Amino acid sequence: MIYAVLVDGVNSEIEEEVSIVVCGQRLTCFASYLPYKLEIGRVYRAELLPMVFGEYIVQEISHVTPSVLREGLGYSYRIIGELRDGCLCCSGLSFCDEIFLADFGFLEGKLISWQVDRLDISFV
């Protein structure tokens, strides 16, 4: 899904590290596709791409507010939301993955936690 994102910061040492604000969430992402120089304070169109490099860690949870929580100082996040039609929906964001339908369809309509290794952003 394409979002309007506000660029909040760009790391001076790692140019692919971009801080954004989207749907009220402040996220630090890895810019996997950066076709132009970004300006802090400008709004751009971009797609958020959760990356899982190994095993999918998905768990049903309860009594937790949907959110996107950064794990440590890297690009890893724990995404908490409701699973709907193969998409994890939380705080105005939607993260879709065919694995949700194939392997986790039994969690449809439930609140789940998903561990992603890296949250990429692709500017369009």
Where are these regions (language model features)?
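Structural detector for short beta-strands of small beta-barrel domains
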Residues: M1-S12, I61-C87, S113-W114
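Short beta-rich binding modules
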Residues: N11, V22, R26, L49-V52, ...
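Acidic (E/D-rich), amphipathic helical modules within compact regulatory domains
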Residues: E15-I61
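Generic recognition of long tandem-repeat/solenoid scaffolds
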Residues: S19-V22, G86-C90
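Beta-strand/loop nucleic-acid-binding surfaces
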Residues: C23-L38, S91-L111, V116-I121
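Intrinsically disordered, low-complexity regulatory/interaction regions
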Residues: E39-L49, F53, Y75, I80, ...
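A structural signal for the main folded, soluble domain(s) of proteins
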Residues: I40, I57-Q59, P66-E71, Y75-Y77, ...
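Flexible glycine-rich surface loops and low-complexity tracts that mediate binding to linear polymers
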Residues: G41-E55, G81, E108-V124
